[in-house]
Amino acid sequence: MMKSNASPSESLSHHTPMMQQYLRLKAENPDILLFYRMGDFYELFYDDAKRASELLDISLTKRGASAGEPIPMAGVPFHAVEGYLAKLVQMGESVAICEQIGDPATSKGPVERKVVRIVTPGTVTDEALLSERVDNLIAAIYHHNGRFGYATMDITSGRFQLSEPQTEEEMAAELQRTSPRELLFPEDFSPVHLMASRQGNRRRPIWEFELDTAKQQLNQQFGTRDLVGFGVEQAKLGLCAAGCLIQYVKDTQRTALPHIRSLTWDRQDQSVILDAATRRNLELTHNLAGGTDNTLAEVLDHCATPMGSRMLKRWIHQPMRDNATLNQRLDAITELKETALYGELHPVLKQIGDIERILARLALRSARPRDLARLRHAMQQLPELHSVMSELKQPHLTELRTHAEPMDELCDLLERAIKENPPVVIRDGGVIADGYSAELDEWRDLANGATEFLERLEAEERDRHGIDTLKVGYNNVHGFYIQVSRGQSHLVPPHYVRRQTLKNAERYIIEELKQHEDKVLNSKSRALALEKQLWEELFDLLMPHLEQLQQLAASVAQLDVLQNLAERAENLEYCRPTLVQEAGIHIQGGRHPVVERVMNEPFIANPIELNPQRRMLIITGPNMGGKSTYMRQTALIALMAHIGSYVPAESASIGPLDRIFTRIGASDDLASGRSTFMVEMTETANILHNATRNSLVLMDEIGRGTSTYDGLSLAWASAEWLAKEIGAMTLFATHYFELTELPNVLPHLANVHLDAVEHGDGIAFMHAVQEGAASKSYGLAVAGLAGVPKPVIKNARAKLQQLELLSSQPAETRKPSRVDIANQLSLIPEPSAVEQALAGVDPDQLTPRQALDMLYQLKKLL
């Protein structure tokens, strides 16, 4: 915006009336772009124009002068505005849309204008601005005494949730899970690093996060006296965030939010917790490069509807612990799979489409004619859907069927009210169906020229005056007229008033035709005004059905997810997992759900056995041998079981899980100034602090980012801590062969390896998991595969032989001048002299004197 040191009244007085109006509206929306409607364009001025010019790559011009200065200006055509808005929203920008609401014909001075909507990344509902199969969330974050309050809303579905992460790690995981398009935070928010590199961050006044203000806002939204009924009364920090969020959404939408009906507490103890690193490493919905190819969601998501696809992704990102709900889902999938009804459901559901987002636009009264046409089409599918579902017996599926009952009254209303193929917008009419309103039909007939009246008038005038060439016509210049050929013009009566002379004819007007013309011209505007009124009344008629429609959308989305998982289970040969109460993971013939889909050759299935007596597997084997794939597939199978899906295995028995941790791969975090090793150690520290006996931990190549001794020491100590202090179910892949000694000194550990076979200078990876430690690492063979020059490989092989020879010699025979590279640090503690002395003593055979002597001997050995 233009900057000035003068007071607002002083500075405005120097501007033209139109710019005064603009500056007043801009002052009400100082932090966002203002699209100011002028005729067929939306214009931006001053700093907004400069910013829009850069972001949208549009021309920056100047508009005359105001207050003695040229005004920077940029604009976009009104008919193309949605494309520009989509681009800005993708960049995290917010835009206020200012429309002309006054009549230019009657306005004295500038036409009255008003901001009619504010488009923000987290509150958009227009189809053109949304990703069809991804949730579009807005969130608010609050921080107090090291703890957080967090609230999210999906305005396109009405879901409104809060949570209270206890640590920065938990908060970071929540931000990654929910990926809000817009994030509100208080002005005094201190852990700003949590929001680094995020688009759409919005600073809000501190008072908007006050608890009393928040409760007042929420009670006002829900029409309640308190929040006890929602079970969120004790979540004070979460409520602070939720209050700010609901106020912001109301302010931007400029209307009521009738579809936001409840607030739920998203408790961590109900979910299998995945931290940010785990979501990234397991490539659930995004791969490591940031795309969506080759992810778990890509493999599992063949949903018929966008709302089903979005629900499936929510399930994937929030696996649950409640076995009753999971078995309910599995029972439903089993019936759909065994009856093959998924094949009949899919095409019907596809016809229903994305009614969830249509309902949000309906609630906000921003639905367009084609939204209601699509809603009508969805309603028309319900009888067939209900018929297909009538064959289902499983209780959860029959419950879903009750929420998908045909809505005949609503369907009939939409069939009567909306034309078969309505235009995109109501602006020019043509939306309300013929026959819905007798008054509208009458005005439309007039607007279309009322051909019956004209035909009758033409016949009467022709017969009355005996003029057989007489006919009634219309053109845009002269309106309605009576045309008579020049040869019969002498028969025209005196009350005919000549309007136009042509070469071979004369055109006349009579009072009766003039009255009709006035009525017709007036009828077009009357018909359009009445149609817009009927359109608004239609919203009022639909609103009482909103809650039932939302239940329908939720049930159809869930049915879609279940039929989709049934189809995936059948076509990808998945098995039903057994969820048990005993700790452990037992998988036979497990496969990686993503890798097996992209491989050209058959995937080698592998078993895994983790139980209270076998809590940690030390995994060794060559690089590229499949260690990381084996670990990831175990985590993905466990995760899929905890969303209630069939899994890629011959059989699977999965015990209770509270968290899944992964420490797999790493790269420099340049934005935060952290090295590869620092990233690795930060993730390791998070695991060692937060893992429990019911956690599944994946540790891959710990310690490789530092020196050999440091790395080996850290890897050994981390494995020992996980085994002795935590007892978590752990897959620990390592290239430090010294760690294969751990199962010999600690209980509940075992060695497994992935083998390979060398032939000449080449190597064949077997990808099969076998018991015991690997015999060698095959590092040189892998280097050869990678294209390392043969002379380098040959030299490395010679050095390897020297090192192996060195390590086999007794230490005292080695030349002191040679660097002792091969003498690796032994991490298995040798017995001390005291321990050796005590080992040979039988306390029961010692006399008091002998015991005293032994004590003095031990003292000397210390």
Swiss-Prot record:
Entry-linked SUPFAM superfamilies: DNA repair protein MutS, domain I, DNA repair protein MutS, domain II, DNA repair protein MutS, domain III, P-loop containing nucleoside triphosphate hydrolases
Organism superkingdom: Bacteria
Entries under PROSITE patterns matching the protein: DNA_MISMATCH_REPAIR_2
Keyword Cell membrane attached: no
GO MF, one annotated term: ATP-dependent DNA damage sensor activity
GO CC annotation, single: cytosol
Residues binding ATP: 621-628
Entry keyword annotation includes Methyltransferase: no
InterPro entries hit by this protein: DNA_mismatch_repair_MutS, DNA_mismatch_repair_MutS-lik_N, DNA_mismatch_repair_MutS/MSH, DNA_mismatch_repair_MutS_C, DNA_mismatch_repair_MutS_clamp, DNA_mismatch_repair_MutS_core, DNA_mismatch_repair_MutS_N, DNA_mismatch_repair_MutS_sf
Keywords, sorted A to Z: ATP-binding, DNA damage, DNA repair, DNA-binding, Nucleotide-binding
Swiss-Prot/TrEMBL GO biological process terms: mismatch repair
A Pfam family annotated for this UniProt entry: MutS_II
Function: This protein is involved in the repair of mismatches in DNA. It is possible that it carries out the mismatch recognition step. This protein has a weak ATPase activity.
NCBIfam families: mutS1, PRK05399.1
The family this protein is said to belong to: Belongs to the DNA mismatch repair MutS family.
Name of the protein in question: DNA mismatch repair protein MutS
The organism of origin for this protein: Vibrio cholerae serotype O1 (strain ATCC 39315 / El Tor Inaba N16961)
Lineage: Bacteria, Pseudomonadati, Pseudomonadota, Gammaproteobacteria, Vibrionales
Name of the gene encoding the protein in the UniProt record: mutS
